[in-house]
Amino acid sequence: TIHRRGESMLKTGMIIAERYEILGKIGTGGMADVYKAKDHKLNRFVAVKVLKPEFREDTTFIRKFKSEAQAAAVLTHPNIVNVFDVGDDNGVYYIVMELIEGITLKEYISKKGKLSVKEATSIAIQVSMGLEAAHSHGIVHRDVKPQNIIISKDGKVKVADFGIARAATSQTITVSAVGSVHYISPEQARGGYSDARSDIYSFGITMYEMVTGRVPFEGDNTVTVALAHLEETITRPS
């Protein structure tokens, strides 16, 4: 069991919530680290997303993080990474999710350069089905990008990290926006209200990158790129 509050990195063999045995770190993001774990209660492998220490003192963020994860747990769909559990163990806040063996769409695009229209269409259909399922439950992703889309070894496409972006405070947005700003909707760039249409815009940018191998707007910093989404016209992918 975890004994020290704010453990910066979980060690192999640690047990979370007297149930999930940490087997190793498999990824990291702006706000959380991801570990492969064994669920000893249901005897299956899972992914455990653990909040980074710098966000564990932000009580407003913690509250939103939990409520959004609980909302996302309602979603069960073949094109969504399903959430199984959420909680905290002695100050370590975690989300337990379906473990997907595969790579992100971002990694796949980087490897291939750009995708054929046929392949991009197949991926796009699966992503849109996952988003439609979420939107029909009133859940908006708010951070749709290739890094949050996973392609499993058997070719199934799944959208990950529902609700986590919404929980982010302005402080966490600044930290994690480096990869996200290229896919941000104009209303998000403006700092205004965003809804399901924001996801569709970000999904459109993702589709653009699939067929061209690049994002439509580049810049020296996040502000420059965000302004481009507000003010500039996207060049047709050809």
Predicted regions and their residues:
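Protein kinase glycine-rich loop
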Residues: 22-29, 34
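AlphaC helix of the eukaryotic protein kinase fold
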Residues: 52-74
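Activation-segment/catalytic-loop signature of the eukaryotic protein kinase fold
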Residues: 86
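Conserved short submotifs of the Hanks-type protein kinase catalytic core
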Residues: 90-104, 108
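Activation segment signature within eukaryotic-like protein kinase domains
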Residues: 123-124
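Protein kinase catalytic-loop region centered on the HRD/HxD motif
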Residues: 127-139
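C-terminal lobe helix-coil module of Hanks-type protein kinase domains
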Residues: 182-238
